[in-house]
C-alpha cells in the first residue's frame, strides 16, 4: 500500500511506483479523497499500467466496495473503526496476510456498509481491531451475531 495526497502524488510515492512497476494500480477512495489528477499522474509515470478507482460516498462504503471487488466470500473478516486510521492500517497488514478484507464501522453502532458486506461475504469469524473506545463491546457482539459467532 502506498499513500498519496488528495490532489498530488508525493515524490516518495512516485519513486516507489517507478521502482515497483506494477501492472495494475488500485486507487482507494472517491474523488474528494483522491482527485482524478492523481490517477492521471500514475498513468503518466506508468504507461500501459491499468489504473482503477474503487470509490464510494464515504470511507465505510469504500471499505465495502474493496471487499466486494476483491473477495466473493471469505472465511473471516477484520473490522476497525472508521473514525481513526491507526487500527485499520495496522490491522490491515495482518488481515491482508491472512487473505481477509478489512471493513470499517462506527464506534457505537454497526455501520450499514460493514453489516451488508458481512452478509455478502458470509465469513465464519470476525476479528475486531482496537480497544472498546474505538469499537464498543456492543458493536463487537453485533458483528459476532451477524456471522453466527455470538
Model-flagged regions — what are they?
Residues 1-150:
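Extracellular glycan-binding segments that recognize GlcNAc-based cell-wall polysaccharides
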Amino acid at each position: 500500500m502506498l499513500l498519496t495526497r488528495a490532489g498530488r502524488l508525493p515524490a516518495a510515492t512516485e519513486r516507489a511506483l517507478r521502482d515497483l512497476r506494477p501492472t495494475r494500480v488500485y486507487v482507494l477512495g472517491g474523488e474528494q479523497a483522491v482527485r482524478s489528477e492523481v490517477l492521471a499522474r500514475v498513468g503518466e509515470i506508468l504507461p500501459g499500467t491499468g489504473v482503477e478507482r474503487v470509490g464510494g460516498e464515504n470511507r465505510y462504503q469504500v471499505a465495502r466496495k474493496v471487499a466486494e471487488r476483491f473477495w466473493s466470500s471469505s472465511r473471516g473478516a477484520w473490522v476497525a473503526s472508521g473514525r481513526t486510521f491507526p487500527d485499520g492500517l495496522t490491522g490491515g497488514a495482518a488481515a491482508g496476510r491472512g487473505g481477509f478484507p478489512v471493513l470499517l464501522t462506527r464506534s457505537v453502532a454497526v455501520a450499514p456498509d460493514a453489516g451488508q458486506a458481512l452478509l455478502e461475504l458470509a465469513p465464519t469469524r470476525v476479528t475486531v481491531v482496537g480497544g472498546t473506545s474505538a469499537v464498543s463491546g456492543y458493536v463487537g457482539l453485533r458483528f459476532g451475531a451477524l456471522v453466527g459467532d455470538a
